[in-house]
């Protein structure tokens, strides 16, 4: 048997073991503490130490490192830097399994933190329940399923007696769900490889890019007044309904988004970037016109639109200029211009389809998962920093991302095992078997 056949045979024989590995990882809560209602769950450290032992037993050289905002101050204007985040009991885990030499190295990466459980679960979110071929638990899809799959792929190669020329490296990080400072710290610590796979859930599709995400709050001022009475002209002190002014601006964003359908599209994304309003808060009393309206929006941006710091500064200005242009067409808004408070800027990244690593991964995908396609992540992942330091990086992992953050999050066992085999094949090809 060749290497791939040996690995697949081992995995077929040890499928129950690899499933139990994921279930045990799901039983260890690792909720990001910035979701306050879950702060008592001991954060990510216990899960990282469980994985560390698994790697140690395979022969990895491992270490735990704790991100520190003060030590990362030089990155304060760049992606992932969150000065108020603390990392007690929140380590990154890094490990390397040395090859025999003269081969290319590969980093396998994922985030160990998960979001809060929320309500309406019918399975214990930290049980790892296995029912009808599905494994349930918070993080099953996002993204302990991917972490378990990439780690099990290395174990299958190791247990099959195969030696590699290149090093295999594992980097599991914290804080992806609340800013991305874990990956910033991992990269700043100097960890590098010739290529990287982030095993975010892609349904086994190959995602060579992810989009950046901007959250902003659009604030529109009005002037309160009795809602049941006739209004005087605003120039004479009459009331101005902030909700009316918000609607005026919202209508203009239809034109904005139509333009973005062409200027913010990408061949590997199923939908273009758009600016969508998600929350609305206005007014103080039922009997008064709203004196202020606040609208929170989500806007996406492409890697090609990043600014010099790897963030969405250019797109922020584009949005601000558009709002200013709309305001200039309304007398009240011209004198009382709306403003935007920026809440979040999550970075993005892209690996060209001309890169050798993309071609190797695509070949393995076609051989192992013929129905899979090349399709970028519409949401944010941690790939930006790896790309920033010159590491060709792709997202490829098991599970349907639409199930992430939901009650009864689950991953299908069949797809999980299929992903392990696929990642193992990529490792064998990229890091090269010895003769």
What do these predicted regions represent?
Residues 23, 94, 165, 169-171, ...:
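Beta-strand secondary-structure signal
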Residues 90, 123, 192, 211-215, ...:
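Short, solvent-exposed loop/turn segments at the edges of secondary structure
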Residues 1-13, 57, 87, 116, ...:
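Metal-dependent amide/peptide-bond hydrolase catalytic core
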Residues 132-135, 140-255, 405-421:
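Fold-level recognition of mixed alpha/beta catalytic cores in primary-metabolism enzymes, strongest
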Residues 2-135, 164, 400:
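Acidic/His- and Gly-rich active-site-bordering loop/insert found
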């Amino acid at each position: 048997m060749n290497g791939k056949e040996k690995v697949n045979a081992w995995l077929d024989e040890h499928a129950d073991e690899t499933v139990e590995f994921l279930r045990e990882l799901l039983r260890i809560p690792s909720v990001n503490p910035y979701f306050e209602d879950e702060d008592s769950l001991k954060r990510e450290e216990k899960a990282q130490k469980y994985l560390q032992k698994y790697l140690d037993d395979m022969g990895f050289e491992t270490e735990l490192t704790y991100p520190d905002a003060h030590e990362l101050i030089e990155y304060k204007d760049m992606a992932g830097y969150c000065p108020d985040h603390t990392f007690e009991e929140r380590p990154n885990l890094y490990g390397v399994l040395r090859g025999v030499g003269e081969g290319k190295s590969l980093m396998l990466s994922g985030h160990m933190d998960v979001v809060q459980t929320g309500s309406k679960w019918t399975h214990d979110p930290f049980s790892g329940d296995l029912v009808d071929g599905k494994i349930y638990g918070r993080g099953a899809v996002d993204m302990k399923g991917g972490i378990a799959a990439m780690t099990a792929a290395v174990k299958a190669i190791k247990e099959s007696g195969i030696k590699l020329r290149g090093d295999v490296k594992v980097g599991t990080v914290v804080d992806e769900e609340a800013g991305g400072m874990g990956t910033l710290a991992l990269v700043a610590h100097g960890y590098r490889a010739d290529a990287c796979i982030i095993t975010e859930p892609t349904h086994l599709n190959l995602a060579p890019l992810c989009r950046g995400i901007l959250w902003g709050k659009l604030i529109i001022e009005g002037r309160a007044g009795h809602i049941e009475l006739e209004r005087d002209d605003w120039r004479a002190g009459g009331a101005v309904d902030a909700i009316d002014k918000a609607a005026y601006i919202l209508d203009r964003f239809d034109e904005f988004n139509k333009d973005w359908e062409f200027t913010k599209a990408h061949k590997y994304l199923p939908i273009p970037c758009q600016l969508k309003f998600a929350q609305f808060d206005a007014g103080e009393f039922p009997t008064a016109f709203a004196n202020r309206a606040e609208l929170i929006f989500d806007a996406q941006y492409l890697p090609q639109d990043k600014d010099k710091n790897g963030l969405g500064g250019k797109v922020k200005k584009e949005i601000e200029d558009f709002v200013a242009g709309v305001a200039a067409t309304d007398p009240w808004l011209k004198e009382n211009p709306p403003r935007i408070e920026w809440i979040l800027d999550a970075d993005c990244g892209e690996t060209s389809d001309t890169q050798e690593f993309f071609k190797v991964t695509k070949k393995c995908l076609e051989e192992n998962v013929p129905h899979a396609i090349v399709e970028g992540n519409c949401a944010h992942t941690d790939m930006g920093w790896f790309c920033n330091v010159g590491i060709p990086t792709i997202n490829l992992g098991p599970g349907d991302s639409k199930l992430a953050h939901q009650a009864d999050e689950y991953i299908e066992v069949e797809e999980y095992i299929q992903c392990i085999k696929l990642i193992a094949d990529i490792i064998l090809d990229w890091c090269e078997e010895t003769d």
